[in-house]
């Protein structure tokens, strides 16, 4: 399966980046890291489609069999960086593509709004968001060692296995 992980945080040293990097490294996948992959602010003008970064984003999403979207929860929603990146994309890249959602929360009750926000946007581009989703709280990220904590690794594995199942069901050649 050709999986793409999109790190939706603009922070270079954030917990979302740690989780995204862990998943990408473990499964040897492509990673778009929005703390480094800088896009202009989406303005809806056609000439933005000609920008090299925008073309690259579209190509990498199109090429993927499945996507993992990760975002911190900012003010009860996904990060502005992720929403901006998604605004450059459409059903042309996402239609029927399986997508897994993962939110990284700052406290014990966050994350669900970011998941719902991502789910709504993905529905708008006709992606197939898988049923399983995850919220990672601070206890799930080992910041000191820049990895995820042992207590969440199995849940991440199950998320990726479900994503893979949906990718294979939609494209038996995967």
From Swiss-Prot:
Cofactors per UniProt?
FMN
| Record InterPro entries | Flavoprotein-like_sf, FMN_Rdtase-like_dom, NAD(P)H-dep_reductase
Kindly report, in one word, the top-level EC class recorded for this enzyme.
oxidoreductase
Source organism, top-level taxon: Bacteria
Gene Ontology CC: one annotated term:
cytosol
The record's EC number reads 1.7.-.-
**Which terms are listed as keywords in the entry?**
Flavoprotein, FMN, NADP, Oxidoreductase
Pfam families for the chain: FMN_red (PF03358)
Where FMN binds, per the record, is at: 9-11, 15-16, 73-76, 106
The GO terms this record gives for MF are: FMN binding; identical protein binding; oxidoreductase activity
Q: What induces it?
A: Part of the yhcYZ-yhdA operon that is induced by the two-component regulatory system LiaS/LiaR in response to cell envelope stress.
Described by its record, this protein's role is as follows: Catalyzes the reductive cleavage of azo bond in aromatic azo compounds to the corresponding amines. Requires NADPH, but not NADH, as an electron donor for its activity.
Oligomeric state and interaction partners are given as: Homotetramer.
Q: Which PANTHER family match?
A: CHROMATE REDUCTASE, NAD(P)H-DEPENDENT FMN REDUCTASE LOT6
Family membership noted in the UniProt record: Belongs to the azoreductase type 2 family.
Q: Any idea what this protein is called?
A: FMN-dependent NADPH-azoreductase
Q: Which gene encodes it?
A: azr
């Amino acid at each position: 399966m050709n999986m793409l992980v999109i790190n939706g945080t603009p922070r270079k040293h954030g917990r979302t980046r740690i989780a995204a990097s862990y998943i990408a490294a473990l499964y040897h996948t492509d990673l778009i890291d929005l703390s480094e992959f800088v896009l202009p602010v989406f303005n809806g003008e056609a000439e933005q489609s000609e920008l090299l970064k925008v073309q690259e984003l579209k190509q990498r999403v199109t090429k993927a069999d499945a996507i993992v979207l990760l975002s911190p929860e900012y003010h009860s929603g996904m990060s502005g960086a992720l929403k901006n990146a998604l605004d450059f994309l459409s059903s042309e890249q996402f239609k029927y593509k399986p997508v897994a959602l993962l939110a990284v929360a700052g406290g014990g009750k966050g994350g669900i709004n970011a998941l719902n926000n991502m789910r709504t946007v993905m529905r708008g581009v006709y992606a197939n968001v898988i049923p399983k989703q995850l919220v990672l709280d601070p206890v799930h990220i080992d910041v000191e060692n820049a990895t995820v904590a042992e207590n969440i690794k199995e849940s991440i594995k199950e998320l990726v296995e479900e994503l893979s199942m949906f990718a294979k069901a939609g494209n038996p050649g995967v």
